[in-house]
Amino acid sequence: SRRQRQMCIRDRYRKQLFVDKSQEGRQAVIYFEGANQEVRFYLNGQFVGEHKGGYTRFCFDITSHLRYGQENLFTIYVNNVYNPNIPPLSADFTFFGGIYRDVYLQFMNPVHIATNDYASSGVYIRTPEVNNSAASVEITTLLTNNTLQPAEIRVENVICDADGKEVKKTHAEIKLASGETKTDISKKIKIDSPRLWDIDDPYRYMVYTRILDKKKGTLLDEVVNPLGLRWFKFDSEKGFFLNGKGRKLIGTARHQDYFQKGNALRDELHVQDVLLLKEMGGNFLRVSHYPQDPVIMEMCDKLGIVTSVEIPVVIAVTETEEFLQNSVEMAKEMVRQDFNRPSVMIWGYMNEIFLRRPYTEGKQLEDYYRFTEKVARALEATIREEDPSRYTMMAYHN
């Protein structure tokens, strides 16, 4: 729309940051929780990387670009000028630009839980079997050795209850070659008489995934993820069931902007929205039409709000392979970044996709329909492959 185009800008951000020499030899990764919509990142005048899409997290490994014991110049170019190959193309919300979510720099041991998997935690928790009497848990961990030597490590997964008391613990011993990234899949972990995650009792365990040096026993890395044990299904005639009980879903959709603030919000405002939903009797949030700040998902987990999360393929598509590929990449980012959220039960990938068709009749319209179907099938297949445990969604009216 004309209003949306008026908000399109090109920004440059610059920051000087002193990096202590004590960090030399460690892995350095910079994370962006959201910047709209095309980013080009430079460090000390050297190009590091780029990212397309304004609503998912991304990160860059900057280890080889840092200067230790001195100042470093971080330069980030961000523009949200209309690009027909990057969704969303058009919608009923404003496409604010710039860096509008948190940015942080993380240092870690060069032998660590992988950071290069679509800015995910590097740990994926699956619950293939859950019922009132028992639950099974599988934990997949991506491991990276960025040293010049092979590494012998011990991988531990510790499941703790909400009070921090250990419930279950598993371990495995792994050898990593220099420069290798390897996947460790835990054996099924059984939890007897689990306390379930539910709308009225959103109980969460926590999973501590640790890497230790096998010989010395020293901690190399640790990642913490939530674990909510629940099972659910949708029935076309009977509705939604959570943990075997029929539940009526009552809720809203939510956009991330506020009057006179745009979408660069403090955490308190995100928290306030979810609290208001809970206080008015809601139990469902459509996180629309794009992945939102991590604090939104954290609050939905904590308060027992069932969620659907979606990528911003809204109203229209562009008939190019680049548009299709960018959409697929967004879907992978979305699923991997929120994979461990117990509140997420639906992944969405299209909204009112034929609302503004570029053609009215004839072969052009038929070709447009066919390409839109191609995008839909690609996104459906991608999400099903990434996470077969949840439902998928396309939203329409009329």
Label each PLM-derived region with a short phrase.
Residues 23-26, 66-71, 150, 190-206:
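Short glycine/proline/serine/threonine-rich loop/turn segments at secondary-structure transition edges
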Residues 1, 6, 10-116, 120-122, ...:
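Accessory beta-strand-rich segments of carbohydrate-active enzymes
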Residues 274-276, 284-398:
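Substrate-binding/catalytic cleft of secreted carbohydrate-active enzymes
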Residues 123, 207-277, 298:
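N-terminal carbohydrate-binding accessory modules
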Residues 45, 103, 205, 244, ...:
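Conserved, mostly hydrophobic/aromatic
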Residues 127-135:
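Short, solvent-exposed loop/linker segments at the N-terminal edge
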Residues 41-43, 134-175, 183-185:
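Beta-strand-rich binding/interaction modules
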